Amino acid sequence: DDCLGIFKSCNPDNDKCCESYKCSRRDKWCKYVL
């Protein structure tokens, strides 16, 4: 499956963001995490 890049909308309960990204519960999009 394709992963979701930065600023892509996402579901925090089913996080499909790319590696190094995390789905923000507040904003509902993929944010970069260090």
Swiss-Prot record:
Disulphide-bonded residues: 3-18, 10-23, 17-30
Tissue expression per record: Expressed by the venom gland.
Subcellular location, record wording: Secreted
Keyword Nuclease on entry: no
InterPro entries for this protein: Huwentoxin-1 (IPR011696), Huwentoxin_CS1 (IPR013140)
Keyword Secreted among UniProt keywords: yes
Database matches in Pfam families: Toxin_12 (PF07740)
Keywords: Disulfide bond, Ion channel impairing toxin, Knottin, Neurotoxin, Secreted, Toxin, Voltage-gated sodium channel impairing toxin
Gene Ontology molecular-function annotations: ion channel inhibitor activity; sodium channel regulator activity; toxin activity
GO cellular component terms listed in the entry, alphabetical order: extracellular region
Role this protein plays: Voltage-gated sodium channel Nav1.7/SCN9A inhibitor.
This protein's domain notes: The presence of a 'disulfide through disulfide knot' structurally defines this protein as a knottin.
Family: Belongs to the neurotoxin 10 (Hwtx-1) family. 14 (Hntx-1) subfamily.
Annotated protein name in UniProt: Mu-theraphotoxin-CCy1a
Organism, as annotated: Chromatopelma cyaneopubescens (Greenbottle blue tarantula)
